[in-house]
Amino acid sequence: MELTGKKLEEVLNAELVGKDVGYQNWKLHWKFTNALLSVIRIFAKRAGLDENAFSYKDQGQSSAYLTYRGVVFGDASFQKQRGERHYGSYDWTFKKIFVNLVNEDGCSSYNGLTFQEMLDRIDEELSAKKSREEAKLEQAKQIFQKIKAELGNVSDYDVVNYIKYMNDNRYSLYK
């Protein structure tokens, strides 16, 4: 199943029409956010993606950020309209919330990528980040062993304290 705005709208029509997802009380925004997340997960599952990889980061009463594997990829802000909080109808929900995620052509309105391309890019970034972190960890292990060898017969605890002391006193152990 191709991931496009039209397909997403079909899912929204099937899952949300006639259901209560719009309201005026911001204290109930969890209900609204969960409805949006449910639709994303339904959409993801139908597209053969891991539905549990999708979540959101709640940013208080005004917005929630949709996430994929913990990475923010869409802003689902509950935007203000005419100075008042406006949650609106299903149509407003699709147009205002999901336009930041995918537009009618299946491309993100802010970076021109399709929904799938956005997820692929996140996967690539996470993989690259993991590689960088593994390289840093290996470098740190080598530095630790080098310092331990230079200090002689000392415990790992003493080496850690030595490193803390050097860093606290603005010596760079990485030069």
Identify the function of each model-found stretch:
Residues 3-65:
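Negatively charged, low-complexity tracts enriched in Asp/Glu with abundant Ser/Thr
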Residues 2-23, 98-164:
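Mixed-charge, Lys/Arg-enriched low-complexity segments
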Residues 14, 35, 44-47, 53, ...:
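A sequence-composition feature that detects small, non-aromatic residues
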Residues 170-175:
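Short acidic DE-rich linear segments
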Residues 58-131:
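Intrinsically disordered, low-complexity regulatory segments enriched in Ser/Thr/Pro
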